[in-house]
From Swiss-Prot:
Keywords assigned by UniProt, alphabetized: Isopeptide bond, Transferase, Ubl conjugation, Ubl conjugation pathway
Organism the protein comes from: Homo sapiens (Human)
Gene: KIAA1586
Function noted in UniProt: E3 SUMO-protein ligase; facilitates UBE2I/UBC9-mediated SUMO2 modification of target proteins.
Glycyl lysine isopeptide (Lys-Gly) (interchain with G-Cter in SUMO2) crosslink site(s): 85, 119, 125
Region (Sufficient for E3 SUMO-protein ligase activity): 1-223
Full protein name: E3 SUMO-protein ligase KIAA1586
GO molecular function: SUMO ligase activity
EC numbers on record: 2.3.2.-
UniProt note: domains: Binds UBE2I/UBC9 and two SUMO2 molecules via its N-terminus. The most N-terminal region interacts with the SUMO2 chain that is covalently bound to the UBE2I/UBC9 active site, while the second region interacts with another SUMO2 that is non-covalently associated with the same UBE2I/UBC9 chain.
Amino acid sequence: MGDPGSEIIESVPPAGPEASESTTDENEDDIQFVSEGPSRPVLEYIDLVCGDDENPSAYYSDILFPKMPKRQGDFLHFLNVKKVKTDTENNEVSKNHCRLSKAKEPHFEYIEQPIIEEKPSLSSKKEIDNLVLPDCWNEKQAFMFTEQYKWLEIKEGKLGCKDCSAVRHLGSKAEKHVHVSKEWIAYLVTPNGSNKTTRQASLRKKIREHDVSKAHGKIQDLLKESTNDSICNLVHKQNNKNIDATVKVFNTVYSLVKHNRPLSDIEGARELQEKNGEVNCLNTRYSATRIAEHIAKEMKMKIFKNIIEENAKICIIIDEASTVSKKTTLVIYLQCTIQSAPAPVMLFVALKELVSTIAECIVNTLLTTLNDCGFTNEYLKANLIAFCSDGANTILGRKSGVATKLLENFPEIIIWNCLNHRLQLSLDDSISEIKQINHLKIFIDKIYSIYHQPNKNQTKLLGTVAKELETEIIKIGRVMGPRWAACSLQAATAVWHAYPILYMHFSHSYSGLAKRLANINFLQDLALMIDILEEFSVLSTALQSRSTNIKKAQKLIKRTIRALENLKIGTGKYESQIEDLIKSDKFKDIPFNKNNKFNALPRSILLDNIIQHMNLRLLSDRNHEDIFNYFDLLEPSTWPYEEITSPWIAGEKTLFHLCKILKYEVDLNDFREFVNNNIKSNNVSIPTTIYKAKKIVSTIAINSAEAERGFNLMNIICTRVRNSLTIDHVSDLMTINLLGKELADWDATPFVKSWSNCNHRLATDTRVRQKSTKVFHENQLAIWNLK
């Protein structure tokens, strides 16, 4: 058999598609080799485990020349895999050629010229011993395969690629029809076949195909470049060019959203940029919609995560309204106090569609939305201190309203009715008790119906009106209804400014209205209502300010009540102008008279009613009277200094209840120091815990004006032209518009990187949906070919 130690035995593996057709006898003691071709080194080595055999000659024959199909035997001369016996084995074979009493385990080593001996790692063997292997492999086979293919790993009897699992996607190296195998990433590769040989061949084929696959090769290239950097950073470095192109697309989408433009405008914007030399592929409205969704999601995730990590106290503001498409929606806002901001921060949370307007549905929608944003029930129990909304029965009903159901889950929260709505209700309650006020309301509503007819009639009516007065007449809306004071003031002031022109119009077509305008009592009532509404408008505007808190609101309300008391004694700004206006040239054509059919308003009774209802609705709130007393503890100007002793026992008892309401512990030593310093001097520094408690008090929202602003933005976004937008899409657009920075200050790069990490395609990827191009007819192009 040749010189000892020099016998060369060549074998061929049953690899490739023919592997499943192998007819080799099923035997545990088989040896299999895989070759990738003459251009690659030795790829596989599987050791042989021997046992007793009565026919040693046949045994060695099977070792030296394994049984195989003829088609596989024809390729023997292509292989460069070699197996060398040791000296001991050759001597034993030469002495006992015909029989062996006991076959020893042969020792083989793979050699490639020059011959290099590799000793297996002991630690790797121990790891193999602890693994659950595929049912067609033994430990030595598994060890040698994992040694040869460094990327191969075994988990729970299944194969996977640790390199592909680490990188997962190709990033900038992505190509069309080239994808990383999900099975190799997730360790889900298993053998196929009904017998051991077929299953072994199946695994060899799968390993071979994955090893030579284009996607795996690109993964290997990425890993070679990641020697001194993490995989994630490497992908981003490889994607720099693509990211820069995608950033420009994100900036375009962001600008469209901030300017409330339809996302379909991106096609025109990108067409212009392509004309200027910028070429990318994310230029359809579908891509723009996905990008807007991603930006909104990332914004919320980052902002709300920071709030939760800071353990900030929060107040929830909600309101309900209908969209253009008549869908009932719930807008949710959140006001919180954070360390980096001196004043509370108001944040838009979401716009949600309501399946039903019953209280239970609203509560479920609210809590589900908050949970989706990361605010769990445990967090809300520890940090939710207040809930604010308008005075609708569904929301603030005492028996089964939203507020009542929230109190069942969070019993310590403060329920606050919007002060602006309460202000309007106090005015409505006052005028509803005086019948004469209805004449003014009916008249202005009649003017509204006349001048808000279809465009043709409106143009005819306003044809003779001066341009400066045309705008004022269009402003005339309804008054004394479910609208805030500023709206009623705008309508009444518009009538005041257009008074002579209205009389001229009505004298020709509406004689009844003209007679009413000629009644001096009507002019006096109009002036009085403008003076009253002006005070209400000033207060309403001040209450809507984001910087107004509970204490400041109380001061503003008391100031307005004093102004109305002064108006009761004297005359208002507009009332004092009546005599001069009647004598002026503008009013000279109006024959003023006193018509007893329309009596003047009982001025004193009206003002008394307004003052009384303002005190009842805005100041004498039994539900919040104790809370106001607790909050006064943080305002030294309200303290009864003549009763204060050191330490202030009564104040410390109140402090205990205040801490329970605010869900924040004020240090007792800080409070005592705060009291002592204020007794000695007025201008003192505020201790840390006292300062934070005052900030938490300011977190309580006093109105739902922000929710009204949100609905105003919703109406701007969801017009009749864009009514196909879903509620979720409108919510995303509102999120970017309300929470996003200005375009000049906004950095799109982090959003693009997170977009890439979510396996979305970048702007340079040609696999994305392409925008449709407008095809010009030959006749349209023909005119440009004229010479």
